[in-house]
From Swiss-Prot:
This reaction introduces a second double bond into the aromatic ring system. Pathway: Metabolic intermediate biosynthesis; chorismate biosynthesis; chorismate from D-erythrose 4-phosphate and phosphoenolpyruvate: step 7/7. GO terms for molecular function: chorismate synthase activity; FMN binding. Its cofactor is FMNH2. Keywords: Amino-acid biosynthesis, Aromatic amino acid biosynthesis, FAD, Flavoprotein, FMN, Lyase, NADP. InterPro entries: Chorismate_synth, Chorismate_synth_AroC_sf, Chorismate_synthase_CS. The keyword Coiled coil does not apply. PANTHER family: CHORISMATE SYNTHASE. It comes from Aeropyrum pernix (strain ATCC 700893 / DSM 11879 / JCM 9820 / NBRC 100138 / K1). This is Chorismate synthase. One of its GO terms (cellular component) is cytosol. Its EC number is 4.2.3.5.
Length: 380
């Protein structure tokens, strides 16, 4: 059973650190030996999430990983991999006011109750998006595992403030470059331009915007998952909902399925070139908690960032009197662009774990046990 700070059973990721502590990091266990990896590769992944730029927090973190164990001469050893990212640009003085005056939308009050007032409140502590850097670093290792199976994951900003990208995700480096070269991680140039104007307007008004990130995983084999509680959609939902500010997730057509008829909602299988495919993908590649061989498609909704300059009413926890707070510190006007690489990373972590678990439980020789390979007719 995964703990509150970890994901996975075979490929297991545990994260640690706080926003304004010495740093954040991840312990990754269950990594096969012999995978080629170095700090430069992980740093390139971290660069995709790093703050800065006109549409993100001005906090300037170098985000350079240190591999402290589990890698020798550029290859994984099979031992646990400890990844550490130092915090450099910390300004804890911004947050003293919020120790007893919880910010609306932040975890300040609930953390005060949960940890009896002993929580690290600087920058949100363990509730800060800063810890997602550790997930991205661990996700870089997970992607090396996925590459062995030919599985690739992409995540991009689907919408900001109601402006929606109209793109067909593709399994190509060209599609990845289109995501990464856009400052909002939106591969639709026209939609991105409209999104930028909205973000700039919200920032001028001292406000923030909500966003949706879509993730797509290609070449995932059918039959992956361990339902009911270990279904692929259940595990992915748990993982992405642990990302700060995530508030909803839907797979395939998601909530739109509630407004369809059964005759139009379900994906019909057919045989093409000796393999089973589906005519549509309204289920998002997952049925009954198991993958069906189609691309996994899901979307994550992120609320508008809670820290905004506009004054808002709160309560002083010492006197229980009314108080007012405004967003100090350095914060993002919209979360989606920096969350997209995080969604991609946790998706890779979940799928790497499931693939390695399947390999451990179902070695290649079990294919001989399928009914038709034994000449059994099937059916009752």
């Amino acid at each position: 059973m995964a703990s509150r700070d970890s994901l996975g059973e075979v490929f297991r990721v545990s994260i640690f650190g706080e926003s304004h502590g010495p740093g954040v990091g991840a312990l990754v266990t269950g990594v096969p030996p012999g995978l080629e990896v170095d700090e430069a590769y992980i740093n390139r992944e971290l660069e995709r999430r790093r703050p800065g730029g006109p549409y993100a927090s001005p906090r300037r973190e170098a985000d350079r990983v240190e591999i402290l164990s589990g890698v020798f001469r550029g290859r994984t050893t099979g031992a646990p991999i400890l990844l550490f990212i130092r915090n450099v640009d910390v300004k804890p003085g911004f947050y003293e006011e919020f120790r007893y005056k919880p910010r609306p939308g932040h975890a300040d009050y609930v953390a005060y109750e949960r940890y009896l007032g002993h929580q690290d409140y600087r920058g949100g502590g363990i509730f800060s998006g800063r810890r997602t850097a550790a997930l991205v670093a661990a996700g870089a290792i997970a992607k090396l595992v996925l590459a062995r199976y030919g599985v690739r994951v992409y995540a991009y900003v689907k919408s900001i403030g109601g402006v929606e990208a109209r793109v067909e995700p593709r399994d190509s480096e060209e599609f990845r470059r289109a995501i990464d070269r856009d400052p909002l991680k939106c591969p639709d140039p026209e939609a991105s331009e409209r999104m930028r104007r909205l973000v700039e307007e919200a920032r001028r008004e001292g406000d923030s915007l909500g966003s949706v990130v879509e993730a797509v995983a290609f070449n995932v084999p059918p039959g992956l998952g361990d339902p009911p509680l270990g279904g692929v959609d259940a595990l992915l939902a748990r993982a992405v909902m642990a990302i700060p500010a995530a508030k909803a997730v839907e797979f395939g057509e998601g909530f739109a399925l509630a407004f369809m008829r059964g005759s139009e909602a379900h994906d019909s299988p057919r045989a093409v070139g000796g393999r089973i495919v589906h005519e549509t993908n309204r289920s998002g590649g997952i049925v009954g908690g198991l993958t069906n061989g189609m691309p996994i498609v899901f979307r994550v909704a992120f609320k508008p960032p809670s820290s905004i300059p506009k004054p808002r009413r709160t309560v002083d926890l010492r006197s229980l009197g009314e108080a007012w707070v405004s967003g100090k510190g350095r914060h993002d006007p919209v979360i989606g662009p920096r969350a997209a690489p995080v969604v991609e990373a946790v998706t890779a972590i979940v799928l790497a774990d499931l693939l390695l678990l399947r390999e451990a439980l179902l070695p290649e020789w079990v294919e001989d046990l399928r009914p038709w390979t034994r000449g059994e007719a099937g059916g009752d």
